[in-house]
């Protein structure tokens, strides 16, 4: 996984019902390979998954370093997570994360500034954190805001 050449998967992509998980796995693989670029593994957004699932980011990284595919990593997570959630709870958490908006003026101002810098000052559809991440990934790799 080379995140200097293309972005990680969208935070909206799900694995085992979890949003964020495929994206953080892409970042983990890139960190292991030394090709993380501007991305960060175990960033605050990733930690929301780790906290909810009850998974240690270093333990997960050890599993990923063994070359496991997404399905095998998910199986390891399900066996080793400290917070046992039902499918419904995972779906609700994922839906909440997917629709989460900046909760304070500082965060909202940060997103508005970054969207404007990307040439999207008139974009009224960038409301959630996931909207912002998708736009940022797109623009970073040559797309138009």
Question: Would you name each region that the model predicts?
Answer:
Residues 67-71, 83-84, 99, 117:
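A short structural micro-motif
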Residues 53-57, 85, 101, 119:
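Short alpha-helix boundary/capping elements
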Residues 5, 63-66, 84, 92:
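Residue-identity detector for glutamine
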Residues 70-79, 83-93:
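Mature extracellular/secreted ectodomains of secretory-pathway proteins
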Residues 35-78:
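Amphipathic alpha-helical packing elements
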Residues 2-40, 89, 93-145:
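Polar/charged low-complexity regulatory segments
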Residues 56, 69-70, 86, 125-128:
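A diffuse structural propensity rather than consistent per-protein peaks
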